[in-house]
Each structure stands twice: as C-alpha cells, then as structure tokens.
Amino acid sequence: MKKIYLLINSLELERGGLTKANLQQASMFSELGYETYILTFNYNSDYNGIIEDIYDVYKVNKKVKIINMYDYFRNEDQIDQKFKSYKNLINDDSIVEKNDSKDIVKIYENGLYKKNISYRSDESIKKIDYFNNSNYRIKVEFYAPEGYIGKLSYMDYNLNRPRQMTFYNSIGNCYLRKTVNPENGLATKVDLIKKGQIVHSFRSDRQLKSYFVEQIVNNNKDSVIISDARNTDDIMINIKNENSSKNVRLHSNHLSPNGEIAKTVMTSLENLKNIDSLIVLTSQQKEDIVNNYGYSEKVKVIPHGIQTLPSKDINNIIRKNKAVVISRLVKLKQIDHIIKAMQLIKDDDPDFILEIYGNGNELENLKSLVKKNKLENNIIFKGYTNNPLEIYNESLFSITTSKSEGFSLSILESMASGTPVISYDFKYGPEEIIDNNKNGLVINLSLIHI
C-alpha cells in the first residue's frame, strides 16, 4: 500500500487555511485507502491533548496518524500521571504576585524575585522561569500535563535566550540535547541519547528533522512525501531516500507585495530539479512560476477543496442584515480597509452589522480603529470559529481584502454557502473563483469605495 507523509511544522487548534488544508487532504488520502501520516517538528508539552482535539474539531479521519518528532524520540507509549499543582510550589513565607488574566504567578523569596510559574486551567504547572539574585533568568522548566519536566532551557544571561536545551522522558532520562546560538536561536550541535549514550549527533535542527523523517519513511518504495509548510521544504529536500516521491505544496502566493519572489519559497523554487512536483493552487500561479523557472511538467495545479454543509435551497435561506469577514487578523489581510468602508455603509444603513471572525496580532489595532470611528455598534469581533460555513450561511455577503493569497479558502467557503463575495483582485484566486457581478464582485486593490 502506498504511504503518504505530510510535513508541517506544527499543529494548533486556532489556525488558518494552511492547517485546514493539511488536515483535510490527510483525511481525504486516508478515506481513499492510503496509509497517511502527518509529521510535525515543534516541541509542545501539550501535544497529546491538542491532537485529540484536532481529530474532533477538524473531523480528521481516525486512521490518519499524527507523529511529533519529540514524542517519537521520547519513545513512550504510556505515562503515569503525576499531577502537580502550582500551589504546591509556594512556600508559606514566599511573597506571591498573581496575574489571573495570564495564569502566571511571580514568587519572591526574602524580597528577591526567584520564580515565574505559568499554569494551565486545571492548575497543573506548565512552565517555571528561574531567576538569580541579579534578576537574570537562568533556566526554564517546561512541564508536561502528566507532571514531569519534558524540557529544560539554560539561558544566556545577557540575551535572555537559550544556550542549551535538554529534553526528558517521564522518568527523567535525557533523550535529546541541543547546543544553541543564543543570537539567532539556531542549534549548532544536536545529540540523540539512549541509555545515557550519544547514538547520533547532528550539526543543525534541520539535519535532526530530516533524520526523523527518514526513520519514519524507512526507505519505503511506495512513499509519497508532501511538504505543506515552507519551513519544512528544506527538511524534505535533504532527506536521504531515493525511493520516495518528494513534493512541495504551495498554499500562498510565491510573490511578495513588491512583486519579488518571497524568501520563504526560494528553497522550493530553486530546487525544482530535486523534487518530483510543485503543487500550486491556480493555473495563473503555475503560468507565472513556469515563465520564471521552467519545469512545466513538474508544476501541477490542484486547488483547495472544502467540506460542504448538507444541501439546502439557497433561495430560502433567511439571511441577516450583516456582512462577515473570516480571516487571520494580520496586516496582509488589510482588515482596516473593511472597517473604513463600514463607515460609508453605516451612513446609508445605520443598522447594518459587520462580524469579524479570527485572531491575530492586529486585533487590538483594529479594535482601536473601530472605536476611533465610533463603529462599536456596527462592528463586532467574534473570535475564532470552527464553523465558517454556518456563519457564511446567515450573512448577506462576505469580504476579502488581502494583498495576496495562494488560494482563498474563505472565498470558496462563502460561495459554497451561497453567500456572494466582495474581494480585492489580488493574486491568486478571486478571478478564477468568482464570476464577477453574478456571485460576487472582484474590485481593484485598495478600492474602499465601490
């Protein structure tokens, strides 16, 4: 049976289109009968709980196997629960400063700041930062939910960044050690350890990650490897397995807003000769890449797909007097343009509502802009949603104002719900998805007033 391995650096619950697409294609491959794996590479002590929720929330086929690199090298099937409450670490004579909004307590001993304890909602310890008498952070302990220390970081006093990291199993044995350059965060030496002995050494994290994939794939002749994230492209390219098909799947525009090739995709584009295929989302993107790099036979077009709601008579859906935006709240998405446009809509229809779903580092700036324009009664921030189709289903229209995309899942989801889309004419997607003036509008970039 052909085995498929999807590479993505990390998985979290509240993620955007790339994660959705990764999980969806994994389920599809599994349902078609392929043995399917998702391989992740980041350290997260809460991964087991996150993965359980991901299967449930994203409806991932249970046959899909999700394997994390650190869990693989830790090599433990079952762990005894050793629950530790952060309260057990507080001495009677300690001074405690609590920050309820961040689930953090600061511990002072004899007047000196000694510890910073982060904890989970069940009061289990998540992380402890230790400080010396000169207030330098000296080390950080990362606790698994089961109560053991899974990772230790020893800090550079001046830069306040790790110099050395050690990773432990549930009985306290070190299975991995890293020496890190604190100036750039890159590992300069990585040791795999078994029974107290170094069994493999690497000069970088990338070498470790490629080795991890090689161990999983195990030179299988019928294996297909797909790199779904740009920070896994070089991992896949450097895998020493001639029998595997190596494929890169782009989920975004390969061009920067200034029209130059984005640095994040340079690895894959410059290694077209070393991979079997580059999968893009639109015919226009393929044409642009082939014109610059050639290899037409290797560049394939496979658009995103979505799971639709049960069939309904779109004409009989009762829609509310509102528009909707579902997006990461980052500068690239230009949500501020929509907020400015809402001022114009409000003048014509004071009761019209805009709902904005999503999270991101622009959230507070966008809230401030809403307040500045006195739009608090017309624009509502709703947070992250796992039910985009239902939300689109009750809206008059949706709006997309990105500078660029690889292929906008939000446009596809909106149209699947029978909800028209107003979208900027960015590369790539709107022109190929929207039938202008029939099921939506494609307008010039940055045209706030239509």
Can you annotate each of these PLM segments?
Residues 384, 403:
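Aromatic "clamp/platform" in nucleotide-sugar-dependent glycosyltransferases that forms part
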Residues 389, 396, 418:
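A short alpha->beta transition loop at the rim of the catalytic pocket in nucleotide-sugar-dependent
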Residues 408-411, 430:
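Short glycine/serine-rich donor-binding loops of glycosyltransferases
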Residues 448-450:
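Conserved small/polar residues in nucleotide/adenosyl-binding loops
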Residues 426-427, 431-437, 441-442:
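Short acidic/histidine- and often glycine-rich active-site loop of Leloir-type glycosyltransferases
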Residues 314-333, 339-342:
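Conserved donor-binding/catalytic core segment of Leloir-type glycosyltransferases
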Residues 247-249, 255-258, 273-291, 295-310:
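Donor nucleotide-sugar binding/catalytic pocket of nucleotide-sugar-dependent glycosyltransferases
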Residues 420-423:
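Short hydrophobic beta-strand element within catalytic cores of glycosyltransferases
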